[in-house]
């Protein structure tokens, strides 16, 4: 089994495997190009994002600056918005559903390092996937976390445990505050009138 395959399976792997640095530098060059573009060049910025990300649906937009380790491990549905200064450490897979709104300074960290110093000093790490459902608006997410659909994550929250569908969650660590109810939906309808 190759080190890249171990990485994709969430197994301890050697981060110095051949090709990894080249993949990282290719992505960082694209991020640099994106970050230097005029903010008004929306079409050009979207084109660079589509070069970076493995798969993305319609209507992807990111504000500057972004940092993405590899890009080929990130997939998103339609209507992805990434606000300023977001970080995606993606040796593991990051998947976003449709209608995902990422607040400023959010981080998605699939890399996880061993507690044991001997292993860590050998440049070994794990990569655990992050999965985000549809209709989600939130802050930072830790490795191995799944966030359900129709979720609101409060500002400044650090998500270290899975969050189910149809809830408001917040805090550090992030926890479910309450379900999203029919009253919330009715309030939304009233605002639209």
Predicted regions mapped to residue ranges:
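Terminal amphipathic alpha-helical/low-complexity segments used for targeting or macromolecular assembly
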Residues: 1-59, 174-193
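Short-chain dehydrogenase/reductase
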Residues: 152, 168-170
């Amino acid at each position: 089994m190759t080190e890249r395959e171990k990485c994709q399976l969430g197994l301890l792997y050697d981060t110095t495997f051949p090709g990894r640095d080249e993949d990282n530098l290719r992505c960082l060059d694209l991020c640099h190009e994106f970050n230097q573009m005029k903010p008004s060049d929306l079409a050009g910025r979207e084109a660079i994002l589509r070069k970076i990300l493995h798969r993305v649906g319609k209507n992807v937009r990111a504000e500057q600056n972004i940092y993405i380790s590899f890009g080929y491990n990130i997939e998103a549905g339609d209507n992805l918005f990434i606000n300023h200064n977001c970080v995606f450490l993606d040796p593991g897979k990051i998947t976003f559903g449709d209608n995902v709104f990422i607040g400023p300074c959010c981080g998605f960290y699939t890399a996880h390092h061993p507690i044991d110093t001997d292993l860590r000093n050998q440049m070994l790490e794990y990569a655990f996937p992050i999965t985000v459902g549809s209709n989600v608006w939130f802050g930072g997410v830790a490795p191995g976390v799944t966030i359900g659909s129709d979720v609101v994550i409060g500002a400044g929250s650090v998500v270290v445990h899975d969050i189910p569908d149809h809830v408001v969650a917040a805090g550090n660590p992030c926890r479910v505050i309450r379900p999203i109810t029919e009253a919330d939906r009715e309030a939304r309808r009233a605002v639209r009138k």
